[in-house]
Amino acid sequence: MNQPAAPAQIRIDFVSDVSCPWCAIGLNALQQALGKLDGEVHADIHLQPFELNPRLPAGGEDATEHLMRKYGSSAQEVEANREMLRERGNSVGFSFDLERRSRIYNTFDAHRLLHWA
């Protein structure tokens, strides 16, 4: 009698900033893809910290102004990217309320808290 093959074991280092919406989308998409493998793969996901904006001042910055300055985008391009983010998030079951988020902050302390939690 044939025994079912043991699932392949893989380690995935997922590098992410806790405030990055694209990272949240990527993690959800990864978890969904792994779920579709129906036990063929056992993935051990290790979350690795990364600061997208380590030089932000303590009070943070207006999110739209920050994105315009960082990427050289217009306000219209920032809004178009937000809409793309909403759509992609919805496609993997993750919804964003980007109208309410008005500031972006340095995440060093958040990463430190997660490390010690």
Regions found by a protein language model. Give the residues of each.
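Extreme N-terminus of proteins, especially the signal/transit-peptide cleavage junction
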Residues: 1-10, 38
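Short active-site neighborhood of thiol/selenol oxidoreductases, capturing the structured segment around
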Residues: 7-21, 26-30, 45-48
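Structural alpha/beta surface segment adjacent to cysteine/selenocysteine redox centers
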Residues: 27-117
